[in-house]
C-alpha cells in the first residue's frame, strides 16, 4: 500500500461511518455569540465557562505584559524562557491549591503526556478510567508501562485491577470532570483505594478548575482530597490557554530534569503568564464567585427544562451537558437543525466517544442569559429530524 492510498483509505473510512471531522472558520467564537459566515449564533460549544476570555482586566494584563516582555518567551524555560511572570504564576498556583510546587506547560495535552512519559517505566502499570482524555490514554499506550482501563467511575473494578500483582509502580489516572460526559469522578473513594495499594493518583481537572469549589479551586478541593499529581488547564475556566502540574518539591525537580515536553519546548509567552495571574485573581474574587453561581443557576435551568424522554440526558451537573442520541447521522442532523435556528452546537461522534453514543455536547457559560437557555430548550424540542 502506498502512502497516498493509506491516507485516502483512512479518510474514506471516516466518511463511510459519518465520523469525518471538519473545522469551521469563525470570526468570533469564545463568548455568548459565535459569528460564522456573517451570521450570528447563540454559542453552546465554547469551553470559556466563566466568560473570562473577554474580561477587560485580563486583556489589559496581557497587553501591558506584551509591551514589557514582547510577544514570545524566546526559548525553553531551561535556557532563557523562564521569566518573573512565569515564576510568579507558579507560586500563586501552588499557594492557591495547597501544593509545594507548580510547573507550567504550554497545553494540557503536553502536561499529561510529559508526566506519564517521564514517570512510567517498564514493569509499571497505569490504571486509567476508560473515559480518560486522549492525551492521557495516548501517553499511557506509548509508555513502556502496562495500561489497564477500569469501567467509568467503577471503584470496585479499579480495586480489582490494582490487586493484580505488579512488579513495578502503579499510577491511577482519573479526571475531575469528564469532558464528554460532564460527570464527576468519586475522587475521594478513588484516592482511598489507590493509597490502599500503595499507588499514586493523577487527576486531570481541566474542566473543574476555576469553576467548582471554594475560590474555584476545583473538583479535588470540592471533594476534600489532594492527589499526588494534579493537572490543571487554563483554556476553560481561566479563559486563556496553557496548563500546570501541581506536585511535591521532589516530583517537580524530577520533571524539570526528565519531562521532555517541558525541557524541549518554548515556554508560554510571559504576557500569557501575566494574563493568567490576572485571571486567577478574578477567579478567587467575589466576582469569580458570582460568575460561578450564575453558571450553576443556568445549568439547573437547562436540566429542569430539557425533555428527557426524547434525549438521554447524562448525570452531569457541570457546564458540560451532553445529550446522547446514539446514531452519528442523527447527531449531525440535530446539530445542523439547531444551527439553522440560530444555536451553535457540536455533534460529537466516535472515536471521541464510544460507538453508539454520538451526542450533542452542549456547554453553558456564565456569558449566557436565562433567555438564551430558554431559546436553546425551545429549539431543541422543536428540532426536526
UniProtKB/Swiss-Prot annotation:
- Keyword Iron tagged: no
Protein's pathway: Cofactor biosynthesis; biotin biosynthesis
Top-level taxon: Bacteria
**What Enzyme Commission number(s) apply to this enzyme?**
2.3.1.47
CDD domains per UniProt: KBL_like (cd06454)
Q: Which reaction does it catalyse?
A: 6-carboxyhexanoyl-[ACP] + L-alanine + H(+) = (8S)-8-amino-7-oxononanoate + holo-[ACP] + CO2
Q: Which residues bind substrate?
A: 21, 133, 352
Q: Which residues carry this modification: N6-(pyridoxal phosphate)lysine?
A: 236
Q: Name one Pfam family in it.
A: Aminotran_1_2
GO MF, one term, reads:
pyridoxal phosphate binding
Q: Does the keyword Transferase apply?
A: yes
Tell me the cofactors it needs: pyridoxal 5'-phosphate
- Keyword set for this entry? Biotin biosynthesis, Pyridoxal phosphate, Transferase
Question: Could you say which protein family the record assigns here?
Answer: Belongs to the class-II pyridoxal-phosphate-dependent aminotransferase family. BioF subfamily.
Role of this protein: Catalyzes the decarboxylative condensation of pimeloyl-[acyl-carrier protein] and L-alanine to produce 8-amino-7-oxononanoate (AON), [acyl-carrier protein], and carbon dioxide.
Describe, as the record does, how this protein assembles with itself and its partners: Homodimer.
Protein name from the UniProt record: 8-amino-7-oxononanoate synthase
From which source organism is this entry?
A: Salmonella arizonae (strain ATCC BAA-731 / CDC346-86 / RSK2980)
The gene name on file is bioF
Amino acid at each position: 500500500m502506498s502512502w497516498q492510498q493509506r491516507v485516502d483509505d483512512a479518510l474514506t473510512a471516516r466518511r463511510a461511518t459519518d465520523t469525518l471531522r471538519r473545522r469551521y472558520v469563525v470570526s468570533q467564537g469564545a463568548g455568548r455569540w459565535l459569528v460564522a459566515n456573517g451570521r450570528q449564533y447563540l454559542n453552546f460549544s465554547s469551553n470559556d465557562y466563566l466568560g473570562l476570555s473577554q474580561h477587560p482586566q485580563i486583556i489589559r494584563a496581557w497587553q501591558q505584559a506584551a509591551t514589557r516582555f514582547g510577544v514570545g518567551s524566546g526559548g525553553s524555560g531551561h535556557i532563557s524562557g523562564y521569566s518573573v511572570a512565569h515564576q510568579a504564576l507558579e507560586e500563586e498556583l501552588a499557594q492557591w491549591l495547597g501544593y509545594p510546587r507548580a510547573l507550567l506547560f504550554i497545553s494540557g495535552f503536553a502536561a499529561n503526556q510529559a508526566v506519564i512519559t517521564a514517570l512510567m517505566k517498564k514493569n509499571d502499570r497505569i490504571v486509567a478510567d476508560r473515559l480518560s482524555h486522549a492525551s492521557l490514554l495516548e501517553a499511557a499506550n506509548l509508555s513502556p508501562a502496562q495500561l489497564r482501563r477500569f469501567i467509568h467511575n467503577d471503584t470496585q473494578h479499579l480495586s480489582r485491577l490494582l490487586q493484580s500483582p505488579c512488579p513495578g509502580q502503579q499510577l491511577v489516572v482519573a479526571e475531575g470532570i469528564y469532558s464528554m460526559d460532564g460527570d464527576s469522578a468519586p475522587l475521594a473513594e478513588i484516592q482511598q483505594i489507590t493509597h490502599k495499594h500503595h499507588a499514586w493518583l493523577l487527576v486531570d481537572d481541566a474542566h473543574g478548575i476555576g469553576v467548582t469549589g471554594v475560590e474555584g479551586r476545583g473538583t479535588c478541593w470540592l471533594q476534600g482530597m489532594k492527589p499526588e499529581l494534579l493537572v490543571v488547564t487554563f483554556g476553560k475556566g481561566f479563559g486563556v490557554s496553557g496548563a500546570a502540574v501541581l506536585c511535591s518539591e521532589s516530583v517537580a525537580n524530577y520533571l524539570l530534569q526528565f519531562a521532555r515536553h517541558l525541557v524541549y519546548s518554548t515556554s508560554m509567552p510571559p504576557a500569557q503568564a501575566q494574563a493568567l495571574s490576572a485571571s486567577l485573581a478574578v477567579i478567587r474574587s467575589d466576582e469569580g464567585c458570582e460568575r460561578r453561581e450564575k453558571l450553576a443557576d443556568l445549568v439547573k435551568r437547562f436540566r429542569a427544562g430539557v425533555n428527557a424522554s426524547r434525549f438521554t440526558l447524562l448525570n452531569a451537573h457541570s457546564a458540560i451537558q451532553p445529550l446522547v442520541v446514539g446514531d452519528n447521522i442523527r447527531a449531525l442532523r440535530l446539530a445542523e437543525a439547531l444551527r439553522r435556528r440560530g444555536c451553535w452546537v457540536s455533534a460529537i461522534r466516535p472515536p471521541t466517544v464510544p460507538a453508539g453514543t454520538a451526542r450533542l455536547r452542549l456547554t453553558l457559560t456564565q456569558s449566557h442569559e436565562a433567555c438564551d437557555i430558554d431559546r436553546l430548550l425551545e429549539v431543541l424540542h422543536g428540532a426536526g429530524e
